[in-house]
From Swiss-Prot:
Pfam families: SPMIP1
UniProt organism field: Mus musculus
Segments of this protein annotated with the region Disordered: 47-80
Origin superkingdom: Eukaryota
Protein name, UniProt field: Protein SPMIP1
UniProt xrefs under InterPro entries: SPMIP1_C (IPR054323)
């Protein structure tokens, strides 16, 4: 049994046009982004190559510098070097940090107790600035409000279900505006 090929001139022209559109799209993409892709590939290939250490040539002995005269004024002491790693968080209080070294996490001490204590602090007091957009949203919420539950079950049932039936016309008071 042979397969039927439903190709008439109209369908054949359609597929030819689709093929040409795809080819033009690929060509345009290649023209637009081809150089960027090649540059990235070259950079990646260059990073994979092993780096060679420079060869050091023996140098002639250099005379030591002349001793500084005692009459020259001494330089002012340089300021303290800045720390290499700047943290996003405020420093931890010493008593909270001491929790790390007391016991082990298995006994709900040590790191476990330290993390739970840190979790109790508000993000505003832990971080210098909002790290993510969720922080910004959360910092604007404020303290949570307590919602009181209705004590009787019938009050909840009567307020939850519609009083006038499922298919009855809606009461104007039932619509949320």
């Amino acid at each position: 049994m042979s397969r039927q090929l439903n190709m008439d001139t109209l369908r054949q022209n359609f597929w030819k046009e689709e093929y040409l559109k795809e080819m033009m799209l690929r060509y345009e993409w290649q023209r637009k982004y081809g150089t960027l892709v090649k540059a990235k590939q070259k950079a990646k290939a260059a990073s994979r190559l092993p780096r060679k250490l420079p060869t050091l040539l023996p140098q002639a002995s250099v005379a030591p510098p002349p001793p500084a005269s005692k009459t020259t004024p001494s330089k002012a002491p340089s300021p303290a070097p800045e720390p290499l790693f700047l943290s996003d968080m405020y420093p931890v209080a010493p008593n909270t940090k001491a929790l790390l070294y007391e016991g082990i996490s298995h006994d709900l001490q040590g790191r476990y107790q330290y993390l739970n204590t840190r979790k109790l602090d508000l993000p505003e007091t832990r971080y210098l600035f909002p790290i993510t957009t969720n922080f910004t949203y959360g910092w604007q919420l404020g303290p949570p409000t307590k919602q009181e539950l209705v004590s009787c079950k019938m009050c909840r049932i009567e307020s939850f279900f519609r009083k006038n039936g499922a298919f009855a016309l809606l009461d104007p008071r039932d619509l949320a505006l």
